[in-house]
Design a protein with these regions (language model features):
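A short, basic/flexible loop-to-alpha-helix module at the beginning of a structural domain
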Residues: 100-110
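Ser/Thr-glycine-rich phosphate-binding loops at phosphate-binding pockets of nucleotides
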Residues: 120-125
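Conserved S-adenosyl-L-methionine
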Residues: 135-142
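Reductase modules of NAD(P)H-dependent flavoproteins
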Residues: 2, 145, 150-256
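Short glycine-centered, acidic/aromatic-flanked micro-motifs in structured strand/loop junctions
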Residues: 25, 73, 119, 146-148, ...
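Conserved beta-strand elements of the Class I
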Residues: 114-118
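Ferredoxin-reductase
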Residues: 2-92
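Histidine-anchored nucleotide/phosphate-binding helix
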Residues: 126-135
Length: 256
């Protein structure tokens, strides 16, 4: 494995907690929508060895055919890396592994039905990449559920809307915001509780979804507690993960 120096070409702070940025794409770098790659900073002026870098895995938000690699990152106040990332600007140097990883891939799911992508926080990145790759060639409809604490952290809805419009798939797509700690009732998402609890309470059925493996395929990406809770409620409804070459009805990513 080698580490490439890349340049920040685009950077937008959505608020004091969340930012979206893009870097130059190294020659020969390949990935599949849904995968992640380690990205970070150098700890010394002339980095040569693995210990000279501070790297963390981030889901890729861009499409494989784009000439850039994009990320959606949340600040961790006591984190080692994200405070450094939030100090960067366009033109600065970051570092990227030469290999992408991850098995949260649409191709590991049975085809057909409605694909529901459940994301917490910046786990949403992977689903933007997937939606850019025309998932309707495999599924009838696509739904993205983004769970965040407050409405101000639901920041990529417009990016999804633009992507879907470019593909002419508005009638086959829905974005659902889920807020768990929004103090202003006028800003709450369609779901105003934790998503696993919303499933248990039948909220998705009230919105018109039959959340069973006969009709739905599910993808999960986010923090470990979210992923574990989602896996449990889906398993309780009969969803199964892929095993070997056998396709599943849900797939999850957890790279913490």
């Amino acid at each position: 494995m080698s580490i490439h120096a890349v340049t920040i070409t685009e950077l937008e702070h959505h608020n004091d907690r969340v930012m979206f940025f893009s870097v130059t794409k190294p020659a020969g770098f390949h990935f599949q929508p849904g995968q992640f790659v380690r990205c970070g900073v150098a700890l010394v002026s002339d980095p040569k060895n693995e210990e000279d870098f501070l790297m963390r895995p981030y889901s890729i938000a861009s499409h494989p055919q784009e000439d850039r690699i994009s990320f959606y990152v949340a600040r961790v106040l006591d984190g080692a890396l994200t405070p450094k990332l939030f100090e960067l600007k366009v033109g600065d140097t970051l570092y990227l592994d030469d290999t992408a990883y991850g098995l949260m891939l649409p191709s590991r799911l049975e085809a057909g039905g409605t694909l529901i992508c459940f994301a917490s926080g910046t786990g949403l990145s992977a689903f933007l990449s997937i939606v850019k790759d025309n998932p309707w060639k495999r599924f009838d409809n696509v739904v993205v559920v983004h769970c965040a604490r407050c409405a101000k952290d639901i920041t990529l809805a417009d990016a999804f809307s633009k992507t879907v419009q470019q593909q002419g798939r508005e009638v086959n797509f829905r974005f659902i915001a889920a807020t768990t700690r929004e103090p202003d009732p006028t800003l709450c998402g369609e779901i105003n509780k934790r998503v696993p609890q919303a499933i248990i309470d039948g909220d998705f059925e009230k919105m018109g979804f039959t959340l069973t493996p006969q009709w739905v395929r599910a993808m999960i990406c986010g923090n470990p507690a979210f992923v574990d809770s989602m896996k449990k409620v889906l398993k309780d409804r009969g969803f199964t993960a892929p095993r070997g070459e056998k396709l599943g009805t849900y797939v999850a990513e957890n790279f913490w």
